[in-house]
Swiss-Prot record:
Xref: PANTHER family: LARGE RIBOSOMAL SUBUNIT PROTEIN BL27M, RIBOSOMAL PROTEIN L27
Record GO cellular component, one term: cytosolic large ribosomal subunit
InterPro entries named among the record's database cross-references: Ribosomal_bL27 (IPR001684), Ribosomal_bL27_CS (IPR018261)
Pfam families, A to Z: Ribosomal_L27
Region described as Disordered: 1-20
Protein name per the record: Large ribosomal subunit protein bL27
BP GO terms, sorted: translation
Keywords recorded for this protein, A-Z: Ribonucleoprotein, Ribosomal protein
Amino acid sequence: MAHKKAGGSSRNGRDSAGRRLGVKKFGGESVIGGNIIIRQRGTKVYAGRNVGMGKDHTLFATAEGRVVFHKGKLGRSYVSVDALPLAAE
């Protein structure tokens, strides 16, 4: 009798899509309030002036201006937004 042994099932073969993390706005770029600057896991970079942090540690601009990266105490990296001066009417 012609029989074929059943093939074994593989336990591999799964993968998840990349999470699209990283810097979205680099130093010197212009941003407006609400623009995402960095998507990260944990606090690789901390929020400086005019930057807020979401519950998933996403850093976003809270004011219009230019993005600036700098080092702070304990060697921590910070990102700030140098706000544009308000135009006089």
